[in-house]
Amino acid sequence: MTTPPSTPGGGAALPDGSASIHELLDVEILEAGPERVVMRLPVDWKVHQPYGILHGGVSALLAESAASFGAALAAEPGRSVVGIELNASHLRSVRDGHLTADATPVRVGRTIQVWRISLTDDEGRAICEARCTLSVLGAPGGASGAVHPPSPAPVTE
């Protein structure tokens, strides 16, 4: 198992170590590798929709996050990945406990990756099934450690 980076507060971090929405939602990375990523977040008032149940967008966020972490680890050094499509089927609601995402690759290609993500509650019941397609950016064999595409150069006249 690969030990994922963390922020000073102990929350999850992006592969470059920066804090993100993952820290705000107390996402934990339980396992991270190019063949499988398992992430978990607590279900509480922060992630509820107005009816007191888990907001579907949070399921989508966790699904794409797990797929993105795995895809970044599966990509060649120097390449980065970005989500280009996410399909999520919400199967049942959750009021409290934890939501766990288990992401595995369906296809890891040179320019496209597809990941399947199963989200479950603390009892192992299916909450959401998702599929995420990611585009692999950058030239093969580029600088090691790139996670995000480079910022555009400033426009000069």
Model-found features: residue ranges?
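Terminal targeting signals and extreme-terminal segments of soluble enzymes
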Residues: 1-157
